[in-house]
């Protein structure tokens, strides 16, 4: 008689548990769909640094006074008030009205600045997804990717990309996805910091980028940042679903009941 009651209780608990799991699986994934609403890259401040260089009011892959492969007050790769990697009131990789990259604040203070508090949730996410990059304000470096095959609209640009793609990044810098309200903000920030960091690192070695290089690099990095967002969103959703599953009352009750049976 006792065994039949125990079996009935176990059956009821399992039904309640799987009902709760079914509800968890119906929860929508964070972030929303791609290409939904508004411009692709809202005009918001980027925590990683300056926005993309001024390009005459065009969006990604849009003309700046001309289509792809057409002059913009000059031919491809020619300077517009100065070549890429050279100062424009503080150019790529050079100070903009202050200290260099990774520097800031006042120096010579009597007291040391207080250390920022560590968010353990972000640390756990970093351990699962990638290493936190020192000196870049909590950005993580993603795993290496194959550079995407992109067509730029002209034979010259396609050939130029195939011949120079090795000079462009194959990894991106990013912050945890839970720090962004949507995928557009994530990709915008990811492209900003990745292009800037790669340009700074390369120009310090004596190699400059042309305007053609920068535009192609932005397109390449954009695709990799989208891929990185999809990976991180999926991992974040799975971690959240696991936490919800094991913290649900039916599961806790079932575990407690099984422990009671084993101990008793």
Swiss-Prot record:
Lipid-anchored residues (GPI-anchor amidated alanine): 241
A GO MF label: copper ion binding
Disulfide bonds: 190-225
GO annotation, cellular component aspect: Golgi apparatus; plasma membrane; side of membrane
Domain of life the protein comes from: Eukaryota
UniProt-listed GO biological process terms: protein homooligomerization
Maturation-removed propeptide residues: 242-264
Signal peptide: 1-24
Residues that hold Cu(2+) 4 according to the record: 96, 98-99
Entry note about domains: The normal, monomeric form has a mainly alpha-helical structure. The disease-associated, protease-resistant form forms amyloid fibrils containing a cross-beta spine, formed by a steric zipper of superposed beta-strands. Disease mutations may favor intermolecular contacts via short beta strands, and may thereby trigger oligomerization. Contains an N-terminal region composed of octamer repeats. At low copper concentrations, the sidechains of His residues from three or four repeats contribute to the binding of a single copper ion. Alternatively, a copper ion can be bound by interaction with the sidechain and backbone amide nitrogen of a single His residue. The observed copper binding stoichiometry suggests that two repeat regions cooperate to stabilize the binding of a single copper ion. At higher copper concentrations, each octamer can bind one copper ion by interactions with the His sidechain and Gly backbone atoms.
Family: Belongs to the prion family.
Role played: Its primary physiological function is unclear. Has cytoprotective activity against internal or environmental stresses. May play a role in neuronal development and synaptic plasticity. May be required for neuronal myelin sheath maintenance. May play a role in iron uptake and iron homeostasis. Soluble oligomers are toxic to cultured neuroblastoma cells and induce apoptosis (in vitro). Association with GPC1 (via its heparan sulfate chains) targets PRNP to lipid rafts. Also provides Cu(2+) or Zn(2+) for the ascorbate-mediated GPC1 deaminase degradation of its heparan sulfate side chains.
Oligomer and partners: Monomer and homodimer. Has a tendency to aggregate into amyloid fibrils containing a cross-beta spine, formed by a steric zipper of superposed beta-strands. Soluble oligomers may represent an intermediate stage on the path to fibril formation. Copper binding may promote oligomerization. Interacts with GRB2, APP, ERI3/PRNPIP and SYN1. Mislocalized cytosolically exposed PrP interacts with MGRN1; this interaction alters MGRN1 subcellular location and causes lysosomal enlargement. Interacts with KIAA1191.
Protein name: Major prion protein 1
């Amino acid at each position: 008689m006792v065994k039949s009651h125990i079996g009935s209780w176990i059956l009821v608990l399992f039904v309640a548990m799987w009902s709760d799991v079914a509800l968890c699986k119906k929860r929508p994934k964070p972030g929303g769909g791609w290409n939904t609403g508004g411009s692709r890259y809202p005009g918001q401040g980027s925590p990683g640094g300056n926005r993309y260089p001024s390009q005459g009011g065009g969006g990604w892959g849009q003309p700046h006074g001309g289509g792809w492969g057409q002059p913009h007050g000059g031919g491809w790769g020619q300077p517009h008030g100065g070549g890429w990697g050279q100062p424009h009131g503080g150019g790529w990789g050079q100070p903009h009205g202050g200290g260099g990259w990774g520097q800031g604040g006042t120096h010579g203070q009597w007291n040391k600045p207080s250390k920022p508090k560590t968010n353990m949730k972000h640390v756990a996410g970093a351990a699962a997804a990638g290493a936190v990059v020192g000196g870049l304000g909590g950005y993580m470096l993603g795993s290496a990717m194959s550079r995407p095959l992109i067509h730029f609209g002209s034979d010259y640009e396609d050939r130029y990309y195939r011949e120079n793609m090795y000079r462009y990044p194959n990894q991106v810098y990013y912050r945890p996805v839970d720090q962004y309200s949507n995928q557009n903000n994530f990709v915008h920030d990811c492209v900003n910091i990745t292009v800037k960091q790669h340009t700074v690192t390369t120009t310090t070695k004596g190699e400059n980028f042309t305007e053609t290089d920068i535009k192609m690099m932005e397109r390449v990095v954009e695709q990799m940042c989208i891929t990185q967002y999809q990976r991180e969103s999926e991992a974040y959703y799975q971690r959240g679903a696991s936490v919800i599953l094991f913290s649900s009352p039916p599961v806790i009750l079932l575990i407690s009941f099984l422990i009671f049976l084993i101990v008793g």
